[in-house]
C-alpha cells in the first residue's frame, strides 16, 4: 500500500486495557498506517501514570511525532497526568458516554475494572465461561466423544483448518461450549459421519479451506510430507465437502477469515446467543 506511515500507539487503562485495545485497533484499521503498539494495563495511580507519561514523552522526543494514545481511566488525577503528555490522547469510553448521558438523562458511575474485572455481579457469568473453556479443552480434536449433548456446537473439518482456535475463541470470548472433531487421512478411504455424532447433527458445523492454503499451513508443521502435499490436501478437502453436502451440514470456507470472523459467522448461522464477558 502506498504512502503508509509508521506511528507509535499506546493503549492505556486502569484495568486490563482490553477495551482500549479493541476499540483502538478498530479505529486504527481505518487508516493506511503501520503501527507499533504498546499496551499498558493497570495504570491505577499517579506514580504509574507519571512513568507512562515519561514513556510517551520519550518517544515524542526521539521521533518528533506525537504518539497516539487511546486510554480508559476512571480517576481524574491519573487521567490528567496522561493528558499532560506529548501524545495525541483519546478517551475511547468518554466519547461514547457523553452522548449516552444526555440521551439517558443519567450520570455515569464509572468504576475501575468494571468491564473485565471479577465482581459479585458477574461471578456466575465468569464461572460459566470457565466451565465452557474446560469443556472445550476436554473435547478438542475428538479427544472425548462423551457428553456431546452438552455441546452448543460441534465443529468438523480436516486437520489444520482452524477448528481448535475457533473453538477456544468461542469458549473464551462468548462462553460457548464448543467441541470439535477432525477428519484425518485414514478416514478418507471410506469417509462417513461417525456414529457418535449422528444424534447431534443439528449441532454440527463444518469448516473447509482452500487446498493451497491448507498445504502451506501443513508444510510448516511437516515439511515435504504426504500430509502437506497438494494432492493430499485437495483430496481431503473434496471428500469432506462432499460429506457436508451429503448430510446437509452447514459449513464455511475459513481461508480468508480471521478466527474472530469465523466464530462470529458460526454464532450467526447457528443462532447461538452472544454472551459478552
From Swiss-Prot:
Any one GO biological process: regulation of DNA-templated transcription
Chain residues that bind ADP: 157-164
Gene Ontology molecular function: ADP binding; ATP binding; DNA binding; phosphotransferase activity, phosphate group as acceptor; protein serine/threonine kinase activity
InterPro entries referenced in this protein's UniProt entry, alphabetically: Kinase-pyrophosphorylase (IPR005177), PSRP (IPR026530), TF_DNA-bd_sf (IPR008917)
Catalytic activity: [pyruvate, water dikinase] + ADP = [pyruvate, water dikinase]-phosphate + AMP + H(+); [pyruvate, water dikinase]-phosphate + phosphate + H(+) = [pyruvate, water dikinase] + diphosphate
Enzyme Commission (EC) number: 2.7.11.33, 2.7.4.28
The protein's enzyme class: transferase
Keywords linked to the UniProt accession: Kinase, Nucleotide-binding, Serine/threonine-protein kinase, Transferase
Superkingdom of origin: Bacteria
Family: Belongs to the pyruvate, phosphate/water dikinase regulatory protein family. PSRP subfamily.
Job of this protein: Bifunctional serine/threonine kinase and phosphorylase involved in the regulation of the phosphoenolpyruvate synthase (PEPS) by catalyzing its phosphorylation/dephosphorylation.
Protein name (database record): Putative phosphoenolpyruvate synthase regulatory protein
Organism lineage: Bacteria, Pseudomonadati, Pseudomonadota, Gammaproteobacteria, Enterobacterales
Amino acid at each position: 500500500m502506498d504512502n503508509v506511515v509508521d506511528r507509535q500507539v499506546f493503549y492505556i487503562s486502569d484495568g486490563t486495557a482490553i477495551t482500549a485495545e479493541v476499540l483502538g485497533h478498530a479505529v486504527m484499521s481505518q487508516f493506511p498506517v503501520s503501527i507499533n503498539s504498546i499496551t499498558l494495563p493497570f495504570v491505577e495511580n499517579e506514580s504509574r501514570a507519571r512513568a507512562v507519561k515519561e514513556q510517551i514523552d520519550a518517544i515524542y522526543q526521539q521521533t518528533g511525532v506525537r504518539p497516539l494514545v487511546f486510554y480508559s481511566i476512571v480517576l481524574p488525577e491519573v487521567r490528567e497526568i496522561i493528558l499532560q503528555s506529548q501524545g495525541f490522547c483519546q478517551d475511547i469510553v468518554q466519547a461514547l458516554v457523553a452522548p449516552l448521558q444526555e440521551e439517558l438523562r443519567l450520570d455515569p458511575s464509572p468504576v475501575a475494572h468494571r468491564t473485565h474485572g471479577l465482581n459479585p455481579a458477574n461471578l456466575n457469568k465468569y464461572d460459566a465461561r470457565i466451565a465452557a473453556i474446560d469443556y472445550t479443552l476436554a473435547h478438542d480434536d475428538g479427544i472425548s466423544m462423551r457428553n456431546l449433548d452438552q455441546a452448543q456446537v460441534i465443529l468438523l473439518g480436516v486437520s489444520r483448518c482452524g477448528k481448535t482456535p475457533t473453538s477456544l475463541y468461542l469458549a473464551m470470548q462468548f462462553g460457548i461450549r464448543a467441541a470439535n472433531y477432525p477428519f484425518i487421512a485414514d478416514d478418507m478411504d471410506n469417509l462417513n459421519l461417525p456414529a457418535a455424532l449422528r444424534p447431534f447433527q443439528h449441532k454440527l458445523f463444518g469448516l473447509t479451506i482452500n487446498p493451497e492454503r491448507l498445504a502451506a499451513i501443513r508444510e510448516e508443521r511437516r515439511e515435504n510430507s504426504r500430509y502437506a502435499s497438494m494432492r493430499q490436501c485437495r483430496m481431503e478437502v473434496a471428500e469432506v465437502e462432499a460429506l457436508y453436502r451429503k448430510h446437509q451440514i452447514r459449513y464455511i470456507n475459513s481461508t480468508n477469515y480471521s478466527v474472530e470472523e469465523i466464530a462470529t459467522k458460526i454464532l450467526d448461522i447457528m443462532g447461538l446467543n452472544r454472551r459478552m464477558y
